[in-house]
Amino acid sequence: MAVNPFKPTAGKMPPILIGRHSIIEDFSEALTNGVGAPGRIMLVTGQRGFGKTVMLTEFRRIAKAQHWEVIGETASAGLVTRLIAALSPSGLRLDQANISPSIGISGIATASLGQAYFSAESNPLTLRNALNKRLGSKKLGKGKGILITIDETQAASHDDLVAIATAVQHVITDADESDTPDEDKKGVAIVFAGLPYMVNDLLDNEVTTFLRRALRRELDNVPLPDVKNAFLETVADSGKTISGEDALEAARQSEGYPYMVQLVGYYMWQSAQRRGSDVITADDVSTGVSDALLAFDDAVC
């Protein structure tokens, strides 16, 4: 049974990433070019439905393919505590964490700006030395590192962002102070993603310097020729066909808005499928656009 190839679900990888080649190259090249490459600290912004979460998923896929370790997080209370736990030896237990300028972890630890001092069984552990410990692992090859992605950055607390910025800057400095050749140094890459106007608000505090030094990329509408070609390729790969003219009309109706591209594609494909046809016609495109608009209104209103 044929399966609809279009995926208009939040955060779901589409069959083809369109119009994002430049940002993907920025990131991939940064991993290759070593510690200090601009793309190793990146801020990705865009309106809802523009594919920020999908971009982070793709970055993690790229990093894994290059034998990096990856940690994917979404900003919410306890972000720094979760990062420390993810970087720490298995079995390390964090209970009742409260991330603020002064952190208390009842019965286990106290912390400040991302520092967490654990009880007798472990050495004092901070986000900085948790990163350094993990980077020192023999499991990581020369020139590799740890990628951290943080989605919905606009929801991050001020103190979490200060803790992360401070830790990452120190880890970069620590690497500089080692005698290891640059091409062999293990490093950290971090990518933040969030809404433009809310992220702008975050730039007006103590993390301004760190985030402003980040390579900033804003996701925008996808060019219509790219959308048309994606429709042609995706439909063909699914076992159906669509004319160039109808694919262009579907692209125009989507206006290059990534979420709408997936909606239009999904419903026009489904229209043909319901007819038992392997050909997506102009009528299927029209039906698909109408259904997509209804679904879009339900999703955003």
Where are these regions (language model features)?
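A short helix-turn-beta junction within AAA+ P-loop NTPase domains corresponding to the substrate/partner-engaging
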Residues: 204-220
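Conserved catalytic segments around the Walker B and adjacent sensor/switch elements
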Residues: 43, 57-79, 146
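Winged-helix-like regulatory helical subdomains adjacent to P-loop NTPase cores
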Residues: 252, 256, 260-301
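A short, basic N-terminal segment
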Residues: 1-42, 86-89, 173-184
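Conserved NTP-binding/hydrolysis module of P-loop NTPases
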Residues: 65, 70, 80-113
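Conserved small helical "lid"/interfacial subdomain of P-loop NTPases
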Residues: 219-246, 264
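Walker A/P-loop nucleotide-binding motif
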Residues: 38-58
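Conserved Walker B catalytic segment
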Residues: 117-197, 205-207
